[in-house]
């Protein structure tokens, strides 16, 4: 078990462990894509070690990170303590039992970096913790959407990062629970490359009209380096 500390672009410390998925590009980019309003109550759904919750952190937000597994959640709690964050809470629970965890309509914004891959797709991750984070064996995309919709009030928003080849799976699941896509942005490794990541922000309730497809984000562009806080 090798632990390390990552300094995030916003200056916060993230404790990591080789047993669990470490900070990746997708969480960093989603944290920049998500636009919670001022003083919002925000839920990181399936937060793991808390990377996304810490990346999106602002002093005005009230953040809850929900995680099923003991190990990642313990690291998240250590990161909260190391950063002395009074507006961040780590909550253990199964998102499939959301009705027993958080009140209906209690959140303004949900963020989620979910398992990308179908449980039957490709090789398994090397540890049970990484399999849970990588593949939808513990919860499905549909169950994630149901959980997000339950905790959001009407007009609340949720932001997801996903694989483009499974985008329809996500959009279909969202539509079933009144989560209407309002912003979509694709991430490309180069100008010539097909997208490798897609980010979707949806709103609970309202018209299906008004979807905005934002300009693509190119890896290692000036904007990309700004997100990482790197002078280029």
Segments (PLM) and residue ranges:
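Short glycine/threonine-rich catalytic loop with a Thr-x-Gly-x-Asp
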Residues: 21-23, 46-49, 192-193
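SAM/dcSAM-binding transferase cores
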Residues: 192-232
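Mobile active-site "lid"/loop adjacent to the S-adenosyl-L-methionine
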Residues: 114-143
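General small-molecule cofactor/ligand-binding pocket signal
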Residues: 15, 89-91, 182-185
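Class I SAM-dependent transferase core
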Residues: 1-36
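Conserved SAM/SAH cofactor-binding pocket of Class I
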Residues: 32-123, 146
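Conserved Class I SAM-dependent methyltransferase catalytic core
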Residues: 19, 138-195
